[in-house]
Each structure stands twice: as structure tokens, then as C-alpha cells.
């Protein structure tokens, strides 16, 4: 049915008043939904091509019929337009664009920037000062790299709270994987040199590092510093041994291999990564498509979106030629500030890598489709068991986690017919209730989640699972009734008498109990969702509990607000380090004077509190 209230968009008139400069255009529907983002070498020509009456496929015709307004951004070059286009696609996910969907956080190796740097696996925002190397295809590749770093350069991996409170070396020192900077068994300049060498290695400059170490070994030998020369000799030997084991092909150097497989509207792009000649493994991606894009278009969209966020290697092998390859090369090279090559139809060893990536892409897509089909079957079984007329498009589940009422956290996880939608997970820190009151915690969490949905006209689930029995279900019912939320089917998931998986009872709003049995695919789906909610709640609770225990003793000290509390914990690496410090050491922290340091020390050690003011 046509929406007669929607304004008519005159695409021809809009295009006619555009310039012929390069740029990016955006198409919007009547409700301001972003339909599509595109780039243009000449905006007037490209935008006008949508409205010139020439034949177009069904997807394009459907999109054009929904346009009520457009806007454009002029850029200095087509390469700049390409970068902007893909930044917008990645951040806004327009309905009709191929979009790289990946709700996982890419793992990196982090080398911190501090007096005694540590090396560690890192996920998430780059909030910690330091250098980030990656991304790596998976955690296994990062751990293998860290293992090499500890063996070769003996850098610390411990958290600051542990590092600052060691009185003797730990096991890592005893097994030769750390030089014990915590107790300064290694001089600061020597440790800094190890950090510099590790950075060279992580940058892919192991050949340069080996040559440099050889020169240092020769110099030490000529200076009759034979112990130092022997240490350098052993390090060179370890590096060469590692290279012999790890290098698949010395010519591979820094290289990404990309292959795409498609079946219907489902696509898989597989990344095979080499860094410094080492095979770091594979990582699959499943871009959102509309079913009418070619594999070449999907691969081109992936290349532009992925390498806008992450630094590209010098060479990227593709399993097929892609559109706008020259433009992509120019944009990626400009972004990386060095030459980046895209290659296809390669020979020799590189052809073998492409074949390997292609085969893995096909196998991974087949596995993913089987998994999604099984997930869809479980979702359909849930619909049938609950007697719903329509397919279940969205399921949410709430769970509560706490330790004897401490640090209560509620979780909300979201599933659709294809599986978890992790980007829409939410946690709620529960406050203002009697500790341990799970009913009040559940009601507060439901109220907060759905109040916002009502105020912002957000998406509601078809089925809302509550981890608990009739009591918890009643709290959820009351919260939804207070908000006037209708059309959401509530189901309580109560553990059986023996709390065994497969013996759960499903409590319905009318008081009925369903016991589907362990083999029922609908119950298996519910268990999957419930277990994910449980995991997400526990993770949040543990983090909140740890933070509360670190800061609670400081909150009771007059004159210690959030900023000073954070400074103290950061300086000493935690409450243990702070308690071990004397008044003079505490007074060295920014914002802490002698009187306040004395008060802090007294409070932490149960002494009479000085009356001195700040």
C-alpha cells in the first residue's frame, strides 16, 4: 500500500542542480531511514542515472521508490569520496548497502607506554596508552605471538597491580620468560632495549633486527664483553630458529589473502593473514547483502570497509578482479601513506594461498549456512510450541547476577532467527533495592529497558524470556503493564527440581507450565538464549564487584572524590599497592597533600584519623 502522505521526490530536478565534482550521496526514506550511501566521480551524472528511466534491477527499483530526500557531500577526489562512503556505510549501516557486519572485537598485541612496559593481548577501544599491533585474525595468533615475545625478549605480562607489589620474582622469571623488572633484576636501559627490539619484531622487521643484533654481538666481542656477546648470539639463534619454523614462505612477508564465497544472499569473505612471513591463520566475515550483488561487488565493499579501519599490508591478494581496483589502491595507499598493492591472477606460491583461502571460504560458508538452518529450525519450533501465528523475529532474555546481594547486575541478550545479536546486548547496574532482592532487581531492569523503548519507539521482542519461575515472571508482567507495553509474550524459564539441563519448566503468563523435554529443539533454543544471558550477567557482575571492592574503602574517606580515587588506584596499581605505601609515598600522588595522605593511611590501617584538613 502506498503511503500517500510521503512527499514526492523529484530526483531529476535534484540531480540537475548538482555539480560534476566527486563526492558522496545519501538517500533517505520518509521516516529518515538511511537507504543507501554511494560515491560518485561526478555527482550530477551518478545521481541522475537513478532517475533517467533506464532499466534497473528489482532491488534498485524498490530503493528508488522509497526515496523522499537526498543529500550530498562534495570531496576533493574520487579516492576521498571512496573513503568517506565506506566510513558512512560502516558507521550507519544503510539498508541497501553491502555492509561488513562483525560484532567481535579484533584482538591486538599491546605494548604499553610506561616506565616498565608490558606486553599483552588487547581487545576493545584503544584507551590504554601504548602501541597496538594488529589486528590479528584470532586470539590464537595473538597468543602465539606473545609466547614468542616472552621467549625472545622476556617482557613482563603482569598487570600493574601485581607488578607494583612484587617482592620477589614470579614463576615467569624462573622459567626464563620474564626478566623480573618488578624487582629490578634487569637494569632499566637493558629492559628498554628489549622493548625496542620487540617493537621491531612486531613491525615485521625481524631481518633488520637480526642484522642489528649481529652488529652488536660483534661490537661486544671486540670489546671483550663475552657474556653480552653470548647473550646476543643466543638471541640471534632463537630468532633464526623461530623464522625457520614459522615462515611458510620467506617471500610472503606482510600479506593478506581474501576470497569470497556466496550462496543466495549469504556471503563469506575469508581473510588469510601473513605477517613477517608467518601464517597467522584465517578469519571469516559474513557481510550483509541484498542478494543481488555479485561476488566481485561484495569483495570490493569488504576491502574498502575493512582497510579503512585497519592498516593494510603492502600486498593484498584477491581471488578475483574487483570493480574500482585502481581507485581502491589509490585510496588505501593514501590512507596508509605508503604503496599498497591489490593483486589477482597470481602464480606460484601465492596462487596456492589464494586457492587455500577460496577453499576455506566455501567450507566456512557451508558450515555457517548449516548452523543458521539449524538455528532457524529451532526458532520455528519455538513458534510452534508457543502457538504463535508469525515467525519469531526477536527474542530477549533477562537474568540477574550478584554475590549475596553485592554488585547486582541484570543482563539482556538479544537473539533473532539467525542467532545472537551481540551489538544489542545490554547490562543494567541495579541500585536502590534491598540487597539480594531478585524480584526488585528484575522489575527495575525490565522497567529501564522497556521505558526507553516506549519513549523512543524502539524495537520490542516477540518473546521475552525471564530466567526464573512464576515470581520473576510476575515482576516482569507488572513492569510491562505499568508501561503499557503490549504484544510481548512473556515466558519464565524455571529450573527443574534437580536443576538439570533439559528438565526446565516454561512458565506461561496464564500459569501453565510446559515441559518440552531435553530433545525438543524449542527448548534447546531457549537454553541457548538463557545460558548466554547467564554468562553475560555473570561477566558484568564480576567486573562491577571487583571495581567496588577496589574503591569502597576509599569512598568513606573525607576529601577523596572520584578523581583522586582514580589517581590513587592508578598510581599504586590497586588497593593492595596503596595499603603497602607509606604516607610519604601517598603524598607524591597528584592532588594529595601531606594531611590527606596521613588521613588515607590511617583509614586504610584502622588507625585514629588525623583531624587535619586538606
From Swiss-Prot:
Keyword list, A-Z: Cytoplasm, DNA damage, DNA excision, DNA repair, Excision nuclease, SOS response
Location of this chain's protein in the cell: Cytoplasm
Cellular component GO terms held in the UniProt record: cytoplasm; excinuclease repair complex
GO molecular-function term, one example from the UniProt record: excinuclease ABC activity
Presence of keyword ATP-binding: no
Residue ranges of every copy of the UVR domain listed in the record: 207-242
Source organism, top-level taxon: Bacteria
GO biological process: nucleotide-excision repair; SOS response
Listed name of the protein: UvrABC system protein C
Native source species: Stenotrophomonas maltophilia (strain R551-3)
Lineage of source species: Bacteria, Pseudomonadati, Pseudomonadota, Gammaproteobacteria, Lysobacterales
Gene coding for it: uvrC
